[in-house]
Swiss-Prot record:
Its main location: membrane. GO terms for cellular component: plasma membrane; respiratory chain complex I. Disulfide bonds: none annotated. [4Fe-4S] cluster binds at residues 35-36, 100, 129. This is NADH-quinone oxidoreductase subunit B. It catalyses: a quinone + NADH + 5 H(+)(in) = a quinol + NAD(+) + 4 H(+)(out). It comes from Aquifex aeolicus (strain VF5). The gene is nuoB.
Amino acid sequence: MVAINSNGFVTTTVEELLRWGRRNSLWPVTIGLACCAIEMMHTAASRFDLDRLGVIFRASPRQADVLIVAGTVVNKVAPMLKLIWDQMPDPKWCISMGGCASAGGPFPTYSTLQGVDRIIPVDVYIPGCPPTPQGLIYGILQLQRKIKEQGITKYDKLFADFNREIEKEGIFVPRELKV
């Protein structure tokens, strides 16, 4: 809840401030495995410009909070994909881009993973073969909406404790400084 008081100051909660920051500065790491990766690169270029949405691609999973899997995932790549997912700090989200990443695509074989959601949790599915840049942008907007609505669930207890402390004391004072 954001409110503006009579002096023109904006007041909000720490939780809402962090939600706003998280959803407006998504840093994805990409797993580009097929033709979907070409469309993803096209989306990041000047015509569609993902930077205007706060999306800045990262080279390291340790600096990213979104994993975009674009293309066919074969069984030999699956352990590496899981490792990349595990290296990402929490909170983290996953976008499955295209029919191949979402359900195996036209490759129902023993060597193809029939959906990324079999090894990591997926937050947004983007259909298409390959999806258009507009589809990827729509998927990112859906992820931003999801972050706004759900918040950062892992830290909900921390926010609840913090907000209770503020309400109890009237102002936040670190526990070790209380007299």
